[in-house]
C-alpha cells in the first residue's frame, strides 16, 4: 500500500474512499485491502470502513470481510520460536517481530529504535519473553541489512520446509506458512 494507495505520509483521502465504496457497493463489488501489514494496523488505518471492506492481512495469513474472520493461518509456538532463534542467529539480522492478533512481539533485548520503527506498521509493539507469548501468531518479520535480504530469504526457505520467506519490498522479510 505504501507508494500506491497511501500517500507519502501514509494517509489517504477518506472522503474519496467513501465515495468509491458507495460505487463499489452499488455494483456488488467488494473493495479489498491486501497487505503484509497486521490486521490491527489495517483496522486502525481503515477505521470507519472496516464494516464495508475485505482485508487480506499478514501477507494472506488472515482474511477478514466486514469485520468477520474468514480465514487464518497461524504458526505454532514451537515453529515461530524456532524461526525466531534461527533468524536472530544470522549475522545480518537486525531484529525480529512476531505478528499476532493482539499485538507485535519482539525479544526483550530488542533495539528500541527497531521497535519504534515497527510502530508504523504494527499496533501494540512490545518487547517481551517470546516464550511467554499467548497470542495467535501469523508471521515472523525479520529485518536484515539490505544487501543480504535475498540471500537470507533463500537460506530460510531451505531450512524451514513448511514456511515461506517473502520480502516486504524493503529491508524486511515475512516468514509465513507455505501455501498462504
Where are these regions (language model features)?
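Conserved acidic, metal-coordinating active-site core of Asp-based
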Residues: 93-180
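Short beta->alpha junction loops/turns
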Residues: 10, 76, 145-146
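A short local structural element in Rossmann-fold oxidoreductases
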Residues: 6, 43, 153
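Asp-based phosphoryl-transfer active-site loop
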Residues: 1-11, 33-35
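Active-site phosphate-binding/coordination module
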Residues: 14-113
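Glycine- and other small-residue-rich loops at beta-strand/loop junctions that grip anionic moieties
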Residues: 9, 34, 72, 175-178
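Short, contiguous strand/loop micro-motifs
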Residues: 6-8, 29, 70-71, 139
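A short, flexible beta-alpha/helix-coil linker loop
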Residues: 4-5, 62-63, 171-173
